[in-house]
Amino acid sequence: MKPRTPPDSPQLFQAVPLVPDFRLELKARKAGHWPVAGADEAGRGPLAGPVVAAAVILDPKRIPEGLNDSKQLSAQRREELFVQILATATVSIASSSSTRIDETDIRKASLDAMRRAICSLAIPASYVLTDGLDVPPGLDCPGQAVIKGDARSVSIAAASIVAKVTRDRMMARAHHVFPDYGFAAHVGYGTAQHRAGIEKLGPCSLHRMSFRPLRKVEDGPQMDELISE
């Protein structure tokens, strides 16, 4: 006779993936804050390219279906949702270049881009939900940092999609200027292909020289300004 699975078996208690919803936004609204923006960034980890932040205020009556953490979506689905978000929500985008990242650090550059995205919204936010551990300093409204926020809040999820698609498009344009690095394929992350290009050519002006793998590498081809801050 096959033994029964004990009640505390991991088979019976597998983690259920989080699905973002509108509860955090409604909680803020109940506290008197409206509209509520979600904010997130893309590109903290790559060796090259900007970090891009987005802020999104969703229309509660026109929330696109299928919003989720951008990392959980295919590139095609991100593109589809990107178009829907721009058509139905208030959106603002800002970036910090690799130069800004090297001058400060990736955390400060990310928060600065997020602050500029939030402050540039056509409709000022009364409250902000951000992904991660920090709310950017210098905002004109209160906010809440939400760990795994892009899996909990549809507004943050929307911002994560906008930031990711925008940055991927920037790196696709960079590929036309510096084709030998393969930016279109890895969007700046430290893949074997990317590291081989750096070893062969040296870094270009999009590389983050403050990042450990690049600190002792000689300069390669340069470009004045592909991506402005």
UniProtKB/Swiss-Prot annotation:
Binding site for a divalent metal cation: D40, E41, D131
GO terms assigned for molecular function: manganese ion binding; RNA binding; RNA-DNA hybrid ribonuclease activity
Keywords: Cytoplasm, Endonuclease, Hydrolase, Manganese, Metal-binding, Nuclease
Reactions catalysed according to its record: Endonucleolytic cleavage to 5'-phosphomonoester
Main EC class the enzyme belongs to: hydrolase
Gene Ontology cellular-component annotations: cytoplasm; ribonuclease H2 complex
InterPro entries: RNase_HII (IPR022898), RNase_HII/HIII (IPR001352), RNase_HII/HIII_dom (IPR024567), RNaseH-like_sf (IPR012337), RNaseH_sf (IPR036397)
Highest taxon of source: Bacteria
Subcellular location: Cytoplasm
Domain RNase H type-2 intervals: 34-223
Co-factor remark: Manganese or magnesium. Binds 1 divalent metal ion per monomer in the absence of substrate. May bind a second metal ion after substrate binding.
Region forming the signal peptide: none
Principal location: cytoplasm
EC assignment: 3.1.26.4
CDD domains per UniProt: RNase_HII_bacteria_HII_like
GO BP terms, alphabetized: DNA replication, removal of RNA primer; mismatch repair
The family this protein is said to belong to: Belongs to the RNase HII family.
Function: Endonuclease that specifically degrades the RNA of RNA-DNA hybrids.
NCBIfam families the UniProt entry points to: PRK00015.1-3 (NF000595)
Record's protein name: Ribonuclease HII
The organism of origin for this protein: Rhizobium leguminosarum bv. trifolii (strain WSM2304)
Taxonomic classification: Bacteria, Pseudomonadati, Pseudomonadota, Alphaproteobacteria, Hyphomicrobiales
